[in-house]
Each structure stands twice: as structure tokens, then as C-alpha cells.
Amino acid sequence: SAHPGVHRLVADLKSRGFNHAKVHEGLYDNFLENRLRFIGHVLLHRMEIFYEYNTALIAVPKSDLLRFDIKTGDTEGLVNFPQTIQGIKLVAVVIDRDEERKWSFRSKGDFDCNAFARKYFEGGGHFAAAGGRSSDPLDVAVKKFIQAIKENKSQLQ
């Protein structure tokens, strides 16, 4: 948060010897090797870019989760990588989890992830970040996503 009170609180903590680098390291610089290899694999082999819709999709099959011994929390943050691609307004990640597919959506600009997730994927969240689910098989869920972005092309331009 960029609220002034947060900055005052952080300044107070720093003046008392708070070691922010140690906290950052514990939270973010603590991957296991398999997680980093998984991220590289899915970015190389599972990410699709739909430039005509300014959209990126990462569809992760169950076989990848098993191959890299990925647990539920290990996919956290995956949705943020494609947001760094110039021109991308919508990012979707779908993870094939047992009986259902879990969706994560992130947007930049004026595309409403919350409305999109509610309308197409039994989900919701916030304007720029939302989640959803699908009971369809992964390939069918991906086809429905592609149809959904086609229906929203004007909002994704």
C-alpha cells in the first residue's frame, strides 16, 4: 500500500532495526529447485500469446504438476510473469487440479477481471485480479477461454 500511514509504520520499524532484506529473502528468495524449473518449463512450453486480443494464457496440465512435484502454493505468482510482456492487457493461468480447473486472471488498463471471471468461470475478485473455476476438462476449458476473449475483443484492444 502507498498510504502515508504505511510509510510511517515502515519508517518506525526501520528505526527499531527491522531487517527488511531478511523478510524479503524469506518470502521471495526461497524457491526449491523444482519450482523454478517448473516456472521455466511452463513459460517456455505452456504459455500462449494471443496478440490480437492482447492476452496471454498459461494452461498447466496435471502431468506438469506431477513431473515437477508441484504443490498448491508453488503456482503462486505464475500469473504475474506474462504481465511483463509489452501490450498484454489480460493474463490467464489455468491449473488442472483433480476434479476442476483453477483459473487466475490479472489485467492492466480498463479490462475488468472480476466481471470476466464471474461471467465465464464461476469466479470473481477485484477489477485487476480475479479467480475462477471450471469443471470442464483442461482442453475444453481452454477453448471456452479463447471463445470468451473473442467475445471481449473490443475491451481488450
List the predicted regions and their residue ranges.
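Hydrophobic helix-and-loop "lid/oligomerization" segment in the mid-to-C-terminal part
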Residues: 1-120, 125-157
